[in-house]
Each structure stands twice: as structure tokens, then as C-alpha cells.
Amino acid sequence: MNDLFLFNNSFQDSFEINTDLFDTNIINLSIVLFVVIRFLGEALSDTLENRKQTIIDSLQNSNKKVYIVKNKLVEVKSKLELTQTEVENVYSSRFSYFKTRKQTLLEQVQSYLTQLQSLQKDSIEGQTKKVLSDVYDTTISKTFDTLYINLASAFKKSGNFSNKKKAITYSYLKRLN
């Protein structure tokens, strides 16, 4: 074995492995590793377990929130459908109401137009009757005036003019009223 080393013998003699020290180092290292693994392993295991539990709790909490949100979504969808149904009902009832109201208003307008036409016809007939009455009154009045003048001139020629004039005037006034 000495041939393998390129060192001379004096160095080899001075360099020796102390196996007692090596055994002690191995024992110390195993104790340290045991203590480290024992205490740090437990702490690491506890930390990992806590982290695992935190993650599980977060997932469960998230699942609960998802469940709540899904329930709220279903509730909102049902309310939306109910609201849409109500809106459609209100729309159809309002449409029906306005259609009926329109028909009623058209009938009222037609009635008013009929009344206006009747009133116009009555007004024209009334005005026609008034004009005819005025023409009749004027004609009768002029006729009586002419008759009075003719009678007056005829009675002037005769002797009893003043008594006959009073009788004719009285008769004329009576007919006018």
C-alpha cells in the first residue's frame, strides 16, 4: 500500500487516522442527526400538518362559498323568471287596457261627432226657421203697412176716418204681438 501513495514514509508515519476520533464523530453526528430529525422533524411535520389543515379548511370554506353562491344564483334566476312572468302579465294587461281604452275613446269621439253633426243640423234648421220667420214677419208687416196705407187713404176719402183708423191700428198691433 505504500507504493500507491506518492508520499514518502515520513509523511505517512505522521499522517494516521485516529479511529477513536472518527468513531466519536460518527456517534456525535448520529446523535445530532437523531435530535435534529426528532425535534425538527416533528416541528416540520407539525408545520406541514398545520399547513395541510389550513389548505383543507380553505378548500372547505371555498366549497361552502361556492355552494352558497350557487344557491343564490338559483334563487336569483327563479326571481328573474318570476319577474319576467310578472312583466309579461303587466304588459299584456296594460296592452289590453290601452286597447280597450282606445276603443272607448274612439267610440266617444264618434258619439261627439254624431252629436256635433246633429247640433249642426239642428242649428241650421233653427237658423233657417228664424230666417223664414223673419222673412214672414217682414212680409206680413210690409203687407199690413201697405194695407193700412191703402185703407187709410180710402177712409180719408170717406167721412169716418178717425174711428176706423183707431180700429185698424188696434187690430194691426194686436196681430203683431
UniProtKB/Swiss-Prot annotation:
It comes from the Eukaryota. Signal peptide: none annotated. It is found in: Plastid, Chloroplast thylakoid membrane. The chain crosses the membrane at residues 26-44. Belongs to the ATPase B chain family. GO terms for cellular component: chloroplast thylakoid membrane; proton-transporting ATP synthase complex. Keywords: ATP synthesis, ATP-binding, CF(0), Chloroplast, Hydrogen ion transport, Ion transport, Membrane, Nucleotide-binding, Plastid, Thylakoid, Transmembrane, Transmembrane helix, Transport. F(1)F(0) ATP synthase produces ATP from ADP in the presence of a proton or sodium gradient. F-type ATPases consist of two structural domains, F(1) containing the extramembraneous catalytic core and F(0) containing the membrane proton channel, linked together by a central stalk and a peripheral stalk. During catalysis, ATP synthesis in the catalytic domain of F(1) is coupled via a rotary mechanism of the central stalk subunits to proton translocation. Component of the F(0) channel, it forms part of the peripheral stalk, linking F(1) to F(0). It is a single-pass membrane protein. This is ATP synthase subunit b, chloroplastic. It comes from Bigelowiella natans. One of its GO terms (molecular function) is ATP binding. In plastids the F-type ATPase is also known as CF(1)CF(0). InterPro entries: ATP_synth_b/b'su_bac/chlpt (IPR002146). F-type ATPases have 2 components, F(1) - the catalytic core - and F(0) - the membrane proton channel. F(1) has five subunits: alpha(3), beta(3), gamma(1), delta(1), epsilon(1). F(0) has four main subunits: a(1), b(1), b'(1) and c(10-14). The alpha and beta chains form an alternating ring which encloses part of the gamma chain. F(1) is attached to F(0) by a central stalk formed by the gamma and epsilon chains, while a peripheral stalk is formed by the delta, b and b' chains.
